[in-house]
Amino acid sequence: MGLLVGDDLWAVVIFTAIFLLLVDLVHRRQRWTACYPPGPVPFPGLGNLLQVDFENIPYSFYKLQNRYGNVFSLQMAWKPVVVVNGLKAVRELLVTYGEDTSDRPLMPIYNHIGYGHKSKGVILAPYGPEWREQRRFSVSTLRDFGLGKKSLEQWVTEEAGHLCDAFTKEAEHPFNPSPLLSKAVSNVIASLIYARRFEYEDPFFNRMLKTLKESLGEDTGFVGEVLNAIPMLLHIPGLPDKAFPKLNSFIALVNKMLIEHDLTWDPAQPPRDLTDAFLAEVEKAKGNPESSFNDKNLRIVVIDLFMAGMVTTSTTLSWALLLMILHPDVQRRVHQEIDEVIGHVRHPEMADQARMPYTNAVIHEVQRFADIVPTNLPHMTSRDIKFQDFFIPKGTTLIPNLSSVLKDETVWEKPLRFYPEHFLDAQGHFVKHEAFMPFSAGRRSCLGEPLARMELFLFFTCLLQRFSFSVPDGQPRPSDYGIYTMPVTPEPYQLCAVAR
């Protein structure tokens, strides 16, 4: 009997191995066509997962681009992926072919946090009616609450004052500015979503931001890629909770805030914020099975907007201050322009931006150099397309490599160096390049771009108006190499702030 069990076991093993090999062959059959983009030979089962450095994906893609060209393919386990590089190809993919390439691939790892039917938020929602409904709502509601208007500018300016006060308290000794920058930017988002402002010492606020920071990278690294490629693994009891502990904790804190907010909502009163406006739409949509306005989707939309709006802008500001202490000559020129245009008494305004070409160029160069979302979020073809003489089938995951655009050697004079003159002409006037694409392009471009531009200019200019920043005495010069998470963050650093 024991021998029989052993034979049966080996039969199962052999059958399973053959089955997996056949599945693997089926998934890679498109690579056999002459018109499919070239790429490295995948291993059976794992594909190219072991051939990509998930701690430095931009560099991995750079090497593959040099070998295979601007359009190359990968096989992530059983998931076909095409990576697109360079300004011309990326813009063609996102803009010219936008109607066919704006879908999102399935990401099963998010199902455990509430993604599902009619609850896919905005950022990861498939390209279609639900996405259009939520994007239209988000853009119009943010405008209703001040986006692009003087009222929100005043709110940001007021928060910049609180940020400068917090910097003043730290000015006696070296400190890491990133936590304070996160608090300031988070308060702007919180004002739009929750109609509230947190004190910087608030324990709940600090716990939420700490948890969010610790969650970065949990869903974008090697483990997340494997689980998305082989979703059956997510059915292993307890695995999602163990793989994404901090992300789950952050979502629990967001749920707590939404429950508290819901208790104070009065449908008879005008909406106080985006959450109120969403709840009003939920009431209107009752009985409509086609609507994406429901309580589950409210949570996902709030998480989308909070994470996207806070993390990217605060990270960019952290890069900005790092680059100021590494390039004191650039900082001096920014100080000079601020003194000439704004002075030391009044607060900076968005109207000043047009008269401050150098400061504007510095902010743009920070975004280009920092390159905080190098591979963008993945897209997916919604139908077969012929692109750059290649055939890409429906359902193929697409990675528009924004890093290859922001560091394109054919566009930028010094692509790997921090060089604000990239955005200035010979007369010192500001010039915006077509290859400046930190917010992506096309239908899936960042809906919060106007808010981010406002925050970057006002926070950066207010800080440089009030302080001079330097590397602390006795400390080594910080590195300008980033840590690859999503987004790419600077290595932890400290600075000294001296009042001007």
Swiss-Prot record:
It catalyses: an organic molecule + reduced [NADPH--hemoprotein reductase] + O2 = an alcohol + oxidized [NADPH--hemoprotein reductase] + H2O + H(+). Signal peptide: none annotated. SUPFAM superfamilies: Cytochrome P450. It is a peripheral membrane protein. GO terms for molecular function: heme binding; iron ion binding; oxidoreductase activity, acting on paired donors, with incorporation or reduction of molecular oxygen, reduced flavin or flavoprotein as one donor, and incorporation of one atom of oxygen. InterPro entries: Cyt_P450 (IPR001128), Cyt_P450_CS (IPR017972), Cyt_P450_E_grp-I (IPR002401), Cyt_P450_E_grp-I_CYP2D-like (IPR008069), Cyt_P450_sf (IPR036396), Cytochrome_P450_fam2 (IPR050182). Coiled coil: none annotated. It is an enzyme of class 1 (oxidoreductase). It is found in: Endoplasmic reticulum membrane; Microsome membrane. It comes from the Eukaryota. Its EC number is 1.14.14.1. One of its GO terms (cellular component) is endoplasmic reticulum membrane. Keywords: Endoplasmic reticulum, Heme, Iron, Membrane, Metal-binding, Microsome, Monooxygenase, Oxidoreductase, Phosphoprotein. Its cofactor is heme. PROSITE patterns: CYTOCHROME_P450. Heme binds at C446. Induction: P450 can be induced to high levels in liver and other tissues by various foreign compounds, including drugs, pesticides, and carcinogens. The modification Phosphoserine is found at S249. Cytochromes P450 are a group of heme-thiolate monooxygenases. In liver microsomes, this enzyme is involved in an NADPH-dependent electron transport pathway. It oxidizes a variety of structurally unrelated compounds, including steroids, fatty acids, and xenobiotics. PANTHER family: CYTOCHROME P450 2D26, CYTOCHROME P450 508A4-RELATED. Belongs to the cytochrome P450 family. This is Cytochrome P450 2D26. It comes from Mus musculus (Mouse).
